[in-house]
Regions:
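Intrinsically disordered, low-complexity segments enriched in Gly and acidic/Ser/Thr residues
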Residues: 406-454
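Hydrophobic helical h-region of N-terminal Sec-dependent signal peptides
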Residues: 8-15
Length: 490
């Protein structure tokens, strides 16, 4: 791919002031009564097809419920804009509101107010799009204008009872092509949002939903709870710790942590998995220590900008997460956010390791030992230095590289035992990774892989042709290339 095209990577950036927002509890503080009901809201994304979107930032600035009589009741109204990155939600859920008290009664619709949004896509067509986006280029996706979307639903909230609303955003349905050479996103299109109140099959008992791979810095820690704050969004989540919470750590050569339970502290950088319980609380199921102490670092999906035999190798990264210790103004800027493009230089002599997370005791993965194992579509995390902004965009030098979890969608092609194969992968993954055997093989692990929407590969709904999304290690190996920590079948 022509690296010059990444000039167009300059991220869509809403003018945001990002401060902590704890999953917006919005708990009632005045005029509250014992007759109030409790509402929780999460957001997830239908596995995408069609246009390959590498990043999409959707700022939700308000949510209300329409009662059968009377005026709408607000259940989410953040004081600052908290953007949600949609592409990761093809396999995950994001917590929007928790433990919100609202009047008991019957409601007929949920209203979602959006600020201006936008993203980054790959032009996999055979023609120039949007005047300047050449074939094979990575380009900005014109976003949807600020709007309010009303989703009809029947909802009865009972006094003292906790309820859950799952918002399913369908980015496919929001993508429009007004002409054969233009593409944009419009969230007023039909069937862009749907709402459900029934937890998906595979959700743990006594839980409404699961929150996966929430990354941030530990801001508070006790024997019974942990608070983690994401750098880009400012969102803070506080979760209970109990005897069932699993502590892991990325390899010590990356994390400087030999054992997750012993080195985690305030200031550590972690990935947290949690359940949103039917008691309207979060319980941490896994804490994966990425860094015992914070250091400048970036994470995102990558693609090659030149040969992997070059010294150093330079890959393009679409930013999905960052940690800034404050010494670098480019990395710390609020404009360095979801979708920002970074040219990442990585020498062959540095450390390349794998974040095995909850599969630590199940596998010894191979296929990520050096710069020659960098593949288009992988999600990597890297300690960085020399982060600078110039005429060609942002560049950085990687000093330590960690393979993390790609979110990839396709269709179930075949299955046998715990394994299955996928077709319909994003075109750039198939095109740019010449060694990838297709249909691509996915390995799942008993008592390791979380299934969402199905109970496992033996579930009747796990069928050939069904859409599927995975959170998986993407290895430069065909035995098999995808090691799945999570599988979602809508």
């Amino acid at each position: 791919m022509n690296s010059k095209c990444v000039l167009l990577l300059l991220a869509f950036t809403a003018v945001l002031t990002l401060t902590a927002c704890s999953g917006s509890k919005n708990t009632c503080t005045t005029n509250c009564t014992t007759s109030d009901a409790i509402v929780n809201v999460t957001l997830f994304d239908t596995p995408p097809t069609g246009l390959t979107v590498l990043s999409y930032s959707l700022p939700i600035v308000g949510i209300s419920l329409t009662p059968s009589t009377g005026t709408p009741v607000s259940i989410y109204s953040p004081t600052t804009i908290v953007p949600t990155e949609l592409t990761r939600l093809q396999a995950e859920s994001a917590l929007i509101a928790m433990d919100v008290q609202v009047p008991a009664g019957t409601y007929t619709a949920i209203n979602v107010t959006l600020a201006t949004s936008g993203g980054i896509f790959i032009n996999e067509s055979t023609t120039v799009l949007n005047t300047t986006c050449g074939v094979g280029n990575v380009c900005p996706l014109a976003g949807g204008a600020a709007t309010t979307v009303t989703i009809p639903m029947k909802l009865t909230l009972n006094s003292g009872q906790a309820s859950w609303i799952g918002l399913d955003v369908n980015l496919n349905n929001a993508i429009t092509m007004p002409t054969s050479t233009t593409v944009a996103a419009d969230f007023t299109q039909a069937n862009t949002f749907a709402a459900t109140t029934t937890p998906r099959t595979g959700t743990p008992s006594n839980a409404f939903d699961t929150i996966g791979d929430f990354i941030g810095t530990v801001t508070a820690l006790t024997n019974s709870s942990i608070t983690v704050q994401n750098t880009i969004t400012g969102q803070s989540l506080t979760a209970a710790l109990n005897s069932g919470t699993q502590f892991d750590a990325a390899p010590s050569s990356y994390s400087n942590c030999a054992n997750g339970g012993s080195c985690i502290a305030k200031g550590s950088v972690v990935s947290m998995d949690a359940t949103l319980t039917t008691s309207s609380t979060l319980t941490a199921t896994e804490i994966d220590v990425l860094d015992a102490a914070a250091t400048d670092e970036v994470e995102g999906v990558i693609y090659p900008t030149g040969p992997l035999t070059a010294t150093p190798v330079v890959v393009g990264m679409i930013l999905a997460d960052k940690i800034s210790t404050g010494d670098n103004t480019t990395l710390g800027a609020v404009t360095t956010t979801f979708g920002t493009g970074i040219f990442l230089a990585a020498n062959t002599s540095i450390n390349y390791v794998i974040d095995e997370k909850n599969l630590t005791n199940s596998i010894t993965p191979v296929g990520f030992a050096g710069s020659g194992d960098l593949l288009a579509g992988q999600q990597i995390r890297a300690h960085v230095t020399n982060v600078t902004s110039g005429t060609s965009g942002i560049s950085a030098t990687a000093t330590n590289v960690l393979l993390r979890w790609s979110r990839i969608s396709g269709s179930i092609n075949s299955f046998a035992g715990n394994n299955f194969t996928m077709t319909g992968l994003p075109q750039y993954i198939a095109t740019l990774n010449s060694t990838l055997i297709q249909p691509a093989a996915v390995f799942t692990y008993q008592n390791g892989t979380l299934f969402d929407g199905v109970t496992g590969t033996g579930d009747p709904n796990f069928a050939v042709g069904k859409p599927v999304a995975i959170r998986a290690l993407f290895l430069n190996s065909n035995a098999p290339p995808f090691q799945a920590a999570k599988v979602r079948v809508p």
